[in-house]
Amino acid sequence: MFVFASSVTKPDVYAACAEPGIRRVAEDDSLVWALENPGTLFEGYNQLLDRAAEVEGLEGLVLLHHDTEIVSDDFMAHVRAALSDPDVGVVGCVGAVGVRTVAWWDGSVTLASFLHRYDEHGGGDLPGSSWIWDEAPASARFGEVDTVDGFLLVLSPWVVQNIRFDESLGQLHGYDFDFCLQVREAGRKVVTADVRAIHNHSLDLVSNPETWINAHIKIAEKWDGRMPGVGWSAGSWEQRARRAEAERDLFLARAASNELRVHAEIPSLERAITEARTSVSWRVTKPLRALQRLGGGGR
């Protein structure tokens, strides 16, 4: 039996995004939980973990953001196959290796089988690098990674019983990276699988810079010396150096967000140009524009 669970702060978004995806893939005996007003994401997910730990015959817990829609019809077959390895603790659809901070995208992304759907600039979609597998880069692969993106997590029964989100880290940022580090430290694997999802999310990747910086620092301090490569950088471990590194990653995240916005604006601008050029006023004034061009060329 699988449990599907979300920590819900916007019920209308859950109904529009997560719920249809769950209905698409859930089995007859699956349990579906929507925990409303959970406090922080850490707290909400821990409540769901505690509840799932009491389910007899649990095969796996699917944790998904309320704005995430599962779109793989064969989702259950792929997560079952991944969890058939008793050493696997976490399964996701976006993952990276060489990750040492909460800015996991600074590592080498090995799989990004998701679609980023946004509302800004008239709305649009930005596909991840392996959303369309035939167009994926040669480096794309399924399998073991350092961390997965937390908008979709599938957890093994062992993880449900033994690992919890660290509520001391803050309210949102870094929860997935820290959780994956805990799972790996316990000797289990974090992997990606051939499943796809749509993440309905703003183009703003870091909405609260201070909470980002604090989570970055806390996770670096927590894992210093515990996991090779995590939090490491040249120089001392003074607070100033930690904060400087956190601010650097923050600005990189903002730059990535700006790049997303630029790509998102292009279709909107193209639509506006097309609408203008096919409008009645554009057609009516076409002779006048032609005369103006002739007049300008004769001067």
Where do the model's predicted regions map?
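Donor nucleotide-sugar recognition loop
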Residues: 147-150, 157, 161-198
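A recurrent flexible, glycine/aromatic-enriched loop bordering the glycosyltransferase active site
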Residues: 120-155
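N-proximal low-complexity "stem/linker" segments adjacent to membrane-targeting elements
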Residues: 1-24, 32-35
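Active-site nucleotide-sugar/metal-binding loop of Leloir-type enzymes
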Residues: 46-60
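Boundary detector for helix-to-coil junctions that initiate low-complexity/charged tails
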Residues: 232-299
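Short beta-strand-to-loop acidic/aromatic patch adjacent to the donor-nucleotide binding site
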Residues: 58-69
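Conserved donor NDP-sugar-binding/catalytic core segment of glycosyltransferases
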Residues: 38, 69, 73-117
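Active-site donor/metal-binding and catalytic loop motifs
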Residues: 188-211, 218-222, 235-238
